[in-house]
Structures are given as C-alpha cells and as structure tokens.
Amino acid sequence: MSWLYEPGDQKHDLDESDVRIRPNPKGSRPRTKRRPNYDALPVGMVLTVNLARYQVLTENGEITATLAKELRKQGAVVGDQVYLDGDLTGDKGSLARIVKIGPRKTLLRRSAEDEKFNEQPIVANADQLAIVMASANPDPNIGLLDRYLASAFASGLDAILIMTKTDVEEAKEFLENLQGLPIKIFKTRSDSFKLKDLKKSLSGKKTVFVGYSGVGKSTLVNALTGTTLDTGDVNAVTGKGKHTSSAAKAIPLEDGWLIDTPGVRTFGLGLIEKDDLLGAFEDIAEITNECPRGCEHQLETANCVLNEENEIPLARLNSFRRLLKVLEAEQWERR
C-alpha cells in the first residue's frame, strides 16, 4: 500500500506513522533476512577434524575444508553432513569451504570433569555406540560404563559392549550390572579375534567406538578395518594405558562406518537431563507419568509409582535407576 490515501481507504486521524520519511543516504543499509540457498551445493561427510581443517568425503573423493565464518561458533564434527563451495578438487594445497551443516539425526557429546557447563560434541549422525572394556588389565570400570550408556541412550544411540581379554578374566560379576538393559554384548580374547558376529552388528551402520586407554580398542579397530592405528601398552605400575588416538576419525567398513575416538578416563554428561534418559526407556517412562511431580524414581522415593507392582523386569528397573543416579550426581555437582 502507498503512504498516500487511496480511494476507498477508511479515514482516520493522522499520526507520526503516516509521515513518509526519506531514508538517510549516509546511513547503513538494513540487513536482509534472506539467506543464500546452499541446498544445491555438493555434499560431503566430515571424516576427521584437525584444528581448523576438516577432512571431508565427497562423491569425487576426499578434500580439505574450512568453516565459513558464520559457522565457527557452532562448529562441525565427525559424521556431519556438510554443504561445500570453493576449491573442491582435492589437489594439494586446495581448500574448500563448509557453508552449511545439515540436520543432525543424533549427536554424541561429553563434557570435561572440570567444565561441567562446556559440552563438547564428538560425533554426529551415528547409529550406535560401541563401548570397549577389558575384563582385566585394566579392570572394567562400572562408573565409566554407566556414563557411556547414559550418554548413548540420551542421544538416541543403540549400545554395544565389547569385552576384551576374556581369556584373562570372564568378568561375570561385572556383566551382571547390565541385566535388563537394551545392550548387545560381545567378547574377544587376547589370543584370538573372532569378529564375525560383531561385524554383522556393525554392517550398514555408523558406529562410534569409545574406551579408555589400554583396553585394546585400537587393536580391535585395526582388526575390523584393516588399518594400522598405533596401539599402546598398559603401565605395570599405574594400570593405565597411553592414549594412541588423538582425534575422532571415521574409517570405512565394507558396509558402514567405524568412528574411532580418543581414549578417555572420564566422560562428563554435560547438560543431559533426566527426561533425556527416560526417552530411551519408553516402558518405564509411561509408568513414571503417574508419579508425583519432582519424583526421583528411586526405590527410597515416597509415592513413586515404579515401586508398585508392574510388568517391568526388576533387573531392568534396577539398571535404569543406577543410570539415573549417575545423572543426578552430575546435576548436583553443577549446582
């Protein structure tokens, strides 16, 4: 509509909004809200990140890219689907530019123990988390396992546990902690790697491998992928291993992807909330809808509906409550 009255306009009192003000030719131009459409650009998957350089796989091969300025705060991680412009030749010294990051189906993240509010995204768009633990030397860590599982379930990932060195110790008591949880368990020996069943579980999926140093993760990754990642020994005094992976890296399988991550001895749960975990236990979540507001869903919690007779297997309920306590302890430390 023009700023002049047109025939048929309803008359009204004039005010300052009816005055047309000529724009100041020396003033700054208003920013447009329109953004470029990058959907037609070539697409790739981030394979690894090294400082500000991203190795990206496109349909024409592997290239090196950097992030567009407006994406630097968000950042891209291994597994991200990204849209590219610039030099896509992949020649030595060439550099493409990541101008858009596609929607993330899943996002695995952690926080450092001393930075509870600073979450670190690790891998995007993965399907499952493979947790590698040794039956002995070093001993399995139930606290770390619970953190891995809580993060996986809250992120929408399936979980796999791979127990190595089962020829040294079977760890039956440790594995009893997992009764009732939706997790596949595989076992390997130091003297032989029978990986047929494990490979079937990895087929057609993007699987993130995690585990602290010395459990045999790099050796296992080498056997599965045919790569030659460095492996490390366990210190006889401390019982701890040396980190042999320095950054997350996506490695192709025959039908799928294996994403190796650096070994860590801590895995902070960052800002994951109780409701995030409940989303992975739909049968339990349905019952907790009847719980009083603010219910902690523990055995000692008064009026908790989970304490009434129900069809949830006791082992599954106990495992859920153990994971929930891990989250509650983390939330308490953040206060």
Task: Name what the model sees in each region.
Residues 158, 165-215, 226:
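Canonical P-loop GTPase G-domain recognition
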Residues 61-78:
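Beta-strand/loop nucleic-acid-binding surfaces
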Residues 39-50:
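Structural detector for short beta-strands of small beta-barrel domains
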Residues 1-12, 18-21, 37-40, 74-82, ...:
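Helix-rich effector regions associated with P-loop NTPase G domains
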Residues 42, 61-65, 229:
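Short beta-strand segments
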Residues 52-56:
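Short aromatic-glycine-enriched beta-strand elements
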